[in-house]
């Protein structure tokens, strides 16, 4: 038997792939609870089992509670920490980071803040240094996202799995994803979901 772990997001767009998926696989293991009912309505004979999201295994409820309260001395600090998560790919950082820096500038004009950018590797770190204006007081950290989320008061993040981590740590988050006008126009015609941030999709509400 051929088992698929993690369903393609055909519930968002390209539902036409459903027939091919049900032909290619004998079982779908889903990481999002709503996917099982989505498949059952459109392909009742295709077996789908919800097995939970891998992120849940990384964080315990006890750790989450401790991180956001007792272990976070900066939670009510006079200098809140704004965490920027522009993405992991070069194109994402090139498009998202300038927008995030503009947002930070607006916030900094109103209150004193600390700003931290978390990036996945040294290559993206070097790219970010070219984008950040000279003299800007911003820290850049490679990896250790969980530690950064423990102390963040606000996150500005690119859409993706990272938004689930922000939700898990209960950090208020602004989600963005900047693309070309052509891609946006095509996506607007094809995408069938109301929200693009995964926490909002799961909650069926505007959490972020």
Region locations from a protein language model:
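Nucleotide-activated sugar donor-binding and catalytic core shared by glycosyltransferases
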Residues: 1-208
């Amino acid at each position: 038997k051929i088992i698929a772990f993690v369903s393609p997001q055909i519930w968002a767009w390209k539902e036409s792939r459903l027939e091919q998926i049900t032909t290619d696989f004998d079982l779908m293991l889903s990481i999002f609870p709503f996917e099982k009912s989505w498949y059952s309505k459109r392909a009742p004979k295709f077996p789908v089992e919800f097995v939970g999201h891998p992120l849940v295994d990384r964080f315990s409820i006890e750790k989450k509670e401790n991180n956001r309260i007792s272990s976070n001395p900066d939670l009510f600090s006079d200098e809140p920490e704004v965490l920027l998560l522009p993405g992991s790919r070069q194109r994402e950082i090139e498009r998202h980071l300038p927008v995030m820096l503009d947002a930070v500038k607006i916030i900094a004009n109103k209150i004193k803040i600390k700003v931290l950018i978390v990036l996945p590797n040294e290559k993206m770190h070097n790219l970010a240094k070219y984008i950040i204006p000279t003299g800007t007081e911003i820290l850049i950290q490679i990896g250790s996202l969980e530690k950064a989320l423990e102390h963040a008061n606000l996150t500005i993040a690119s859409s993706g799995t990272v938004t689930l981590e922000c939700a898990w740590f209960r950090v208020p988050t602004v989600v963005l994803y900047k693309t070309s006008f052509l891609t946006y126009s095509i996506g607007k015609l094809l995408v069938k979901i109301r929200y693009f941030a995964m926490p909002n999709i799961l909650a069926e509400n505007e959490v972020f």
